[in-house]
């Protein structure tokens, strides 16, 4: 963090992107400015955003690979230049882009001799490769080579115990951190009592999202983190009061969900994830905190279950219902069956 004195004028608090560039497929850069801030506020915002950007942004990566009958990760496979460990490290570096949650399966199945790159990975429709030229292995002989992969969306750095699994699969330390680096600097402007601060924020990402998208998600996460304090008085009310306040007078939310479940019989609801429903970030995060990742999970919740979710409010319930009616009308059943 750098602090400097510069001349400047005060105006309404605003932010903008002052520089944006793509250095490579796996390196995006963005520079943002927020001003004017009162003395001390720039540090507060800068520290919070840096932590949120580096630790709270979700990413998609390969978490497991199955080679078949390979005794251990230090083994070599005939006809392949790299060892199993080197292949695992190459798979760890693959950058993926996806907005869906849960575990996904992928695979590689090729015949040598040839180079294997990220382009050879057979992915589900919801996942995209950022750089298809990333190397994986080099087949030096005419052999059939197949790997089963597991893909997961998460946040932070996840490690697993190194052990031999009975099915021949090996864990890959998941680095679900799309933001590679964050720097911020603070500049002072004005004179005397009119001094203000300008915050400059630099963000580097791995290409799975842009710096602007990362900044938006980090800001949204920080807002959601402080929401319970804004509604502390509301949550302090008795459950009976909340129940009365949340229940519509003529047609309860639970009855509407029950009718929706009956009408949607036969749809693979466990294949429809809630991030496909265009929920607001607040409503979406409430549902995720209650372990409702799919539409089936959401419809399995009773009204009481929803009311017990932290920060869940009446507008969230109305928004969920309106969104379900919008995306799952009766006349679209056939289309939904094609998921």
Swiss-Prot record:
Keywords: Chloroplast, DNA-directed RNA polymerase, Nucleotidyltransferase, Plastid, Transcription, Transferase. It is found in: Plastid, Chloroplast. Residues 1-233 are annotated as: Alpha N-terminal domain (alpha-NTD). Belongs to the RNA polymerase alpha chain family. InterPro entries: DNA-dir_RNA_pol_insert, DNA-dir_RNA_pol_RpoA/D/Rpb3, DNA-dir_RpoA, RBP11-like, RNAP_asu_C, RNApol_insert_sf. One of its GO terms (biological process) is DNA-templated transcription. It catalyses: RNA(n) + a ribonucleoside 5'-triphosphate = RNA(n+1) + diphosphate. One of its GO terms (cellular component) is chloroplast. This is DNA-directed RNA polymerase subunit alpha. Its EC number is 2.7.7.6. Residues 264-339 are annotated as: Alpha C-terminal domain (alpha-CTD). DNA-dependent RNA polymerase catalyzes the transcription of DNA into RNA using the four ribonucleoside triphosphates as substrates. GO terms for molecular function: DNA binding; DNA-directed RNA polymerase activity; protein dimerization activity. In plastids the minimal PEP RNA polymerase catalytic core is composed of four subunits: alpha, beta, beta', and beta''. When a (nuclear-encoded) sigma factor is associated with the core the holoenzyme is formed, which can initiate transcription. It holds the Pfam family RNA_pol_L. It comes from Crithopsis delileana. The N-terminal domain is essential for RNAP assembly and basal transcription, whereas the C-terminal domain is involved in interaction with transcriptional regulators and with upstream promoter elements.
């Amino acid at each position: 963090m750098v602090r400097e004195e510069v001349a400047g004028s005060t105006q309404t608090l605003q932010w903008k992107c002052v520089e944006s560039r793509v250095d490579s497929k796996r390196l995006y850069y963005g520079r943002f400015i927020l001003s004017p801030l009162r003395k001390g506020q720039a540090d507060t915002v800068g520290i919070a955003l840096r932590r949120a950007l580096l630790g709270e942004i979700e990413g998609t990566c390969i978490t497991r690979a199955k080679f078949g009958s390979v005794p251990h990760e230090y083994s070599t496979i005939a006809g392949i230049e790299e060892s199993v460990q080197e292949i695992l490290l190459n798979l760890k570096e693959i950058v993926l882009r996806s907005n869906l949650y849960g575990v996904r399966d992928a695979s590689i199945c090729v015949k040598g001799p040839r180079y294997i790159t990220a382009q050879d990975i057979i992915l589900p429709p919801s996942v995209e490769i950022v750089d298809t030229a990333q190397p994986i292995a080099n087949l030096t002989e005419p052999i059939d080579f197949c790997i089963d992969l597991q893909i997961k969306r998460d946040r932070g750095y996840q490690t697993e115990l190194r052990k031999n699994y009975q099915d021949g699969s090996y864990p890959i330390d998941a680095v679900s951190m799309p933001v590679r680096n964050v720097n911020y600097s603070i500049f002072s402007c004005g004179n005397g009592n009119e001094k203000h601060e300008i915050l400059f924020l630099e963000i580097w990402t791995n290409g799975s999202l842009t710096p602007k998208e990362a900044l938006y998600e980090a800001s949204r996460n920080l807002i959601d983190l402080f929401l319970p304090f804004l509604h502390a008085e509301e949550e302090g009310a008795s459950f009976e009061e909340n129940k009365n306040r949340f229940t519509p007078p003529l047609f309860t939310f639970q009855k509407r969900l029950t009718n929706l479940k009956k009408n949607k019989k036969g749809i693979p609801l466990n294949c429809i994830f809630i991030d496909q429903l265009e929920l607001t970030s607040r409503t979406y995060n409430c549902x995720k905190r209650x372990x409702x990742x799919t539409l089936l999970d959401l419809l399995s919740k009773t009204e009481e279950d929803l009311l017990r979710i932290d920060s869940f409010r009446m507008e969230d319930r109305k928004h969920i219902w309106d969104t379900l009616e919008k995306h799952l009308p009766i006349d679209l059943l056939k289309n939904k069956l094609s998921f």
